[in-house]
Amino acid sequence: MDNFKIYSTVITTAFLQVPHLYTTNRLWKPIEAPFLVEFLQKRISSKELKNTKAICHIDPSWVNLNASFIRDDMISIKATTDDMDLDAICRISLPLPMNTNDLTAELEKMKRILLDLSEKFNLELIITKEPAYFTPEQTGESKELCIYVHALGFRSNLMECEPQLLAFVDLIKKNGMTLPPQHYIIEPMELNSYSVLPLYMGVDMENFKHISRAFKTSIYAPSLITLSRDLKANPQIFFSGAVHSLSLLARKTLRESISVNSKSFFYRRLTNITPGKLLFIRKYYQQKVNQLILKYQSLIRVTNEYIEFQSISTNLLEMVIKNFTIQVLHEIVEVQISLNENCAMSPELIIDSFFGHTGNQIVVITPKEDSFNQLIVVGNQSSTDEASDTSILHYLSDFIMGSNQVINPNLRQIKAIFEIHPDFEDFISGKKNGKLTRIMELSACLIQLEMEEEDDNLYLNLVSDSFPDFKESFKNVINEFPAEESFFIPEVCHRPIIGTGGSLIQATMRKHNVFIQFSNSFNLPQNKISMIRYDNVIIRCPRKNKANICLAKNDLKQIVQEYDSLQSKTLIRFSSGQYRHILHVNGQKNIIGQIEKNENVYIMIPLKEPLDGTSQLSIQGNDENASRAANELVNSAFGYEYEFKIDQEIDPNKEYEFYNLIVVPFLQIMNIIVTFEKDLITFTFEKDTNENTLTKAIELLSNYLETQKTKIIFKKIIKKFVLGSASSKSNTSNSNTNGNFRSMNNAKSRTTIDNTSQSGASPQRHKMPVITTVGGAQAIKGYIPNTYYNGYGYGYGYTYEYDYNYANSNKAQTNNRHKYQNGRK
């Protein structure tokens, strides 16, 4: 792109220095930028301006600058730039409650760490007595003294510093400004690379949530935005908790449960994406990219040159690439504008026309010349903002049909380039290219579908020499783009939904003019600390009919509910210790998926641990299969349990002793999960645990309880967990696609232990997961050949498709690269 300029909007902030209790004084500078000086002179005197310091960055190459006060201490600056660097000045502001009357002494204790963070990340750390740079939430009247910690600097530096700063502030909050910490501690865990961060986070952050609940530990990790940056330092995850042994165990559990060193990683890059489109994705699609990263536990890294994907399985890799293409690349379009040779455009005209409103979501590419008659505009197919029109057609209309009356009379050609996943070739074009032919018959345009040997995706080109015809054809084309929604329905319900010979599903598809695809997810990867239910149903239709997707989905849910009411359910005794045991076994062997597949049942294991004491786990299927599956699950994934009833509850002020002397050592040394709640202590252990080990564990527990003047009044060992069948009618309410369980106790018979008043922790259950040491096998890296995706995940095993308007609407794309044209001669 040496011969081109790429224009886009840059938004940054100028922070003015305010009265403060402390500042590291690293980035404050006198205001020298001419634009900012001129702007501030309208509000403050020259003398005040001379004595005012600020943190800001205004590049001399920026043009079309605009500024406005966000607050008295903050100025928003918007400009047009031809620099692809997205870094801007930002802030992190954190309230910090104080529990001391000697504020000066406590600030002195904080200075060393703040100075270290400032130097390490090149940031300004400032403490103010009053809220600055943000408006705090109103939480009612509070007499608690509060100060405010602010980090100011470039966004990239803030993202690296953020987990350490959050952990530090959390530590101070919980320790009442007592440094060094007396109760709460921080344990770091260094990762080999930012690329493995999604794997540790888990689907929708469930791994972190699970670890946090289990170990009463707060977890702070780097932002996912860092995945698109070339950061030199290895990332760190921080664990903060009141019990040191639990924080150490939380770190060990997360590291060993994911076991990165024993996994193979698979990579793929999309390299044929233009720099303008890559910049647009980085500026306006980061949130969507983050959602895909968390949903598929896969790296998506968008750079100036390519998009890189990394995953732990080829299946997940292809799924994330396809969904990225649908949800991101499908939504972005490039439009090439060519004028007559005697009509030239200037950079000033382009900036004034496209960036006159500095909030425009658009990228413009022009030759690096003083005048030119061609340019490329990158934007969204349709508006992404309900309050204002952010579609590319809106910007093009203002430019071409605007008041200057220069562009439209001299328009030679306008061409839109859409990037489409190869699987949707027939979906877009229709039977015998009928859809595209109809669009061309309605307005004067040419439509081409192209795919070269080196291309990752299919390209649809829409060409016209008239903007009104182009606009009409553009709308008709995007109306034929696929709209879809994916979700999970238990595989046991698929065949009843489909019906004999596909009769039910065809009726649903015909009724709503959509088509529905089913897949199984039995063999997709699981981990040892969370249960993942992957989407296995897709409803798809042309975008013009997307409202029908919700209607079809509701019909499917109704069929599922009716089927559930006819199914029997086998109940299994279920506890939090067994929940952790099952997750550990399932992460190694995928037991749940295999049983569901072999027995045609649905194991309604919850996605979160049960919190209401001993519960009931349901298995749904026919009488024989559900019962057989229940026994198989208990035999292959359950451990035995020992329950101990004690004569008084464990003293909340002595919980840390119980963790340090019983819970953690028993798990680490004897592989016994110890959970306790109110007056009940439970051991969960492997079935082949040595009898001597159990005897020793019971002896140690008894000895500890004696020191607390507590004794065991009842104990029993539990080896049978299958409770038998439940009537379908009474259990219909438990049929939930996210898993379900029923408490075996009254709601008030088990309570959470809230030790907030003792150590500042939020109310938590006290349960421990199974931990098994994982070997340090070297990672084996596999590479995906540079071929495009060919229909994985939507119907392998069985597929039923029906299109009311056109046959074979989603025929699988073959691997034969081709190029063809369908247009007017």
Curated annotation (Swiss-Prot):
This protein's UniProt keywords: Cytoplasm, Phosphoprotein, RNA-binding
GO MF, any single term: mRNA binding
Annotated InterPro entries: KH_dom, KH_dom_type_1_sf
Localisation per UniProt entry: Cytoplasm
List of residues that carry Phosphoserine: 762
Feature: compositional bias, Low complexity: 727-740
Region (Disordered): 727-766
Keyword RNA-binding: yes
Domain KH per the UniProt entry, residue ranges: 482-556
Predominant subcellular localization, coarse grouping: cytoplasm
SMART domains: KH (SM00322)
One CC-aspect GO term: cytoplasm
Something else known: Present with 922 molecules/cell in log phase SD medium.
Protein name according to UniProt: KH domain-containing protein YLL032C
Native source organism of the sequence: Saccharomyces cerevisiae (strain ATCC 204508 / S288c) (Baker's yeast)
Upper taxonomic lineage: Eukaryota, Fungi, Dikarya, Ascomycota, Saccharomycotina
